[in-house]
């Protein structure tokens, strides 16, 4: 039976060995690039695959059409996923004739999602296990094929429990893989009423809340001790990591976090006390508790807890959905640079925001707004400002996937708007210059211009009207129920990290990225309808500065406002954009790495975008509102933006060439 395997970590190695033992014909293994911090503790799927002479790949996006086609060509009978960290698309899951199976580290339907072992210890569970289940589009929700239970001891840590889970997985595979190979296996539907979901944990989640009971705090210590970053607290500004502790059933009359004794080191909790067995200062060694107290100059009755400065300054909390996108990642950079914001972000990937992951003011979860509704509602309730930036915003998708555009851009975002109403939170909503449609004004004005779109059979307008309808709904909630909002309308923002060349290869990108791909691959630059359409191109840094000032909202000037953010002086046709880009390409220091220019090629919009497309001849913003409300004007010339964008993509392309 031919198998494709998606695997990572120790469990991935266990799964591959079990499949080999059971006689499966492994056609290919997909994994992730090894993290040396993890491989110090856990085995490498890539190395095991190499030792077994199995084809192994580590694509950045396995759901890309190119990889889907390669998997289709292998004609797998079955697909297995063992601790692979990316969600597999329906297109991949449908390729296996026998089905797709995933091993999950809990007794489903409990503890769906990420880090189930850590969460089980944290929540004080006494039992967990492993589950092999059928894979469906919703994560961890398919029919259960087999389970194996594991007891959690009071002394178990995430590492020791992982060892038990590994042994349980081996036993489960020995039992069930022959059944799958024979095509005779049970499939029990999950009880959705019993389902629980937990998201990804990050290092900042290890901060100790001393108001909790000693048992709860000790569970946190056990859940995140080595090889994880550890549970931590602060003595003033100095960080203390607690690696091992013991809860004591002692009563006291002190404030939580008070040091009751230094030898042994005992700290008061909301209920009971906690003896610190081993710990470490930020710059010190792993030591016993009483030695830690000496190193930190602790005395009886001193208090540990949150970092001193965080108790003084309350930073504004900003929720960004779609944080890995073009606007999201640049906005995150600007907010972190300011220093007065904590950012909570969600996206289905993290390629553009890896540079922020270690920042303590950036909190990221990998997830899908279609699925992680509980997480979203909780963080809307928790945060001060909400920016729902998730949308399909590439023209070819408007005609290729109009219903998906409507479902994501309107229906899913409407849920977020209603949560903001429910919890009285400020929403900054990304409208679009597309809402103006075929407006015949010389400049598009937020307050007076007509919003004109084409006939129903021109499906490209589904994006425009989805956004426009949400604009109207948000405005109505503001008028009738007091929703605090600002609508901003970007006009052709561009710069580094706008889409990527892989998305351009399947036509799902904005204009400049598509043009750069043509230059990189030596294919003709296609000018849709001759490229005579005019746009006003705005540098991402100009755009983000305006958006940052909307978030600041000094004196509340942006409340209830619609604000165009564009650069009217950077007006050019698509053909002119292509010509400037070509000149910059020919002058670039990396030019010799790429094929000769293949010329311009005029194509009709119908053949390029498909049936149902209709274009707009010009789109120039009035920016009076931005000037008046934000004290903002764009300053960056289009040629500078083109040069920086081209340089970013060319260096990335050369780096890829070096890998291949």
Curated annotation (Swiss-Prot):
GO terms for cellular component: membrane. InterPro entries: Arna-like_SDR_e, Bifun_polymyxin_resist_ArnA, Epimerase_deHydtase, Formyl_trans_C, Formyl_transf_N, Formyl_transf_N_sf, Formyl_transferase-like_C_sf, Lipid_A_modif_metabolic_enz. Residues 1-304 are annotated as: Formyltransferase ArnAFT. Gene3D superfamilies: 3.40.50.12230, NAD(P)-binding Rossmann-like Domain (3.40.50.720). The record marks 102 as: Transition state stabilizer. The active site is at 104 (proton donor), 434 (proton acceptor), 619 (proton donor). One of its GO terms (molecular function) is carboxy-lyase activity. It catalyses: UDP-alpha-D-glucuronate + NAD(+) = UDP-beta-L-threo-pentopyranos-4-ulose + CO2 + NADH; UDP-4-amino-4-deoxy-beta-L-arabinose + (6R)-10-formyltetrahydrofolate = UDP-4-deoxy-4-formamido-beta-L-arabinose + (6S)-5,6,7,8-tetrahydrofolate + H(+). (6R)-10-formyltetrahydrofolate binds at residues 114, 136-140. NAD(+) binds at residues 347, 368-369. One of its GO terms (biological process) is lipid A biosynthetic process. NCBIfam families: PRK06988.1, PRK08125.1, PRK11908.1. Bifunctional enzyme that catalyzes the oxidative decarboxylation of UDP-glucuronic acid (UDP-GlcUA) to UDP-4-keto-arabinose (UDP-Ara4O) and the addition of a formyl group to UDP-4-amino-4-deoxy-L-arabinose (UDP-L-Ara4N) to form UDP-L-4-formamido-arabinose (UDP-L-Ara4FN). The modified arabinose is attached to lipid A and is required for resistance to polymyxin and cationic antimicrobial peptides. HAMAP family: ArnA. PANTHER family: BIFUNCTIONAL POLYMYXIN RESISTANCE PROTEIN ARNA, UDP-D-APIOSE_UDP-D-XYLOSE SYNTHASE 2. This is Bifunctional polymyxin resistance protein ArnA. It comes from Photorhabdus laumondii subsp. laumondii (strain DSM 15139 / CIP 105565 / TT01).
